[in-house]
Amino acid sequence: EGDIINVDVSTILDGYYSDASRMFVIGKTTNAKQRLVDCARECLEIGMKAAKPYGFLSDIGYAITKHAHAAGFSVVRDLCGHGVGLEFHEDPDVEHYARKPGRGMLLVPGMVFTIEPMINMGDWHVFIDAADDWTVVTEDELPSAQWEHTFVMTETGLEILTY
């Protein structure tokens, strides 16, 4: 009761990968945890709006960082979104933390990538649990939330490939 969990699912269709995740609240939770889950989803949506054809990768991270910090949360810096295609993790790295917009790789039509901001209630530092070499844990043991979609950049903007 009161826990928040992330379910991250990847699929392969005709040799092409996709990646998506969602947050779920188990029963009733605290207002603080609900705000965190909501903020993480808002950060995904804000990152999507910031991703424009011929814009820059850092535009995404800057928009996410600005929103999360305004809400009183931190953005994990050690993990990022990624290109997706015939391999599960491809270039480019899509960082969700940025101090300035207008930097990094140009976002061009045809690019397929994920946006998956991980938003922490406390500090941004995380580590990978050695028990399974996959589970991400916050160093301060405070809650974290993450939402993710896979997109293709078109001439007019992002098209969501996952639901």
Task: Describe the residue ranges of each PLM region.
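Active-site neighborhoods and metal-handling regions in enzymes and metal-associated proteins
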Residues: 1-163
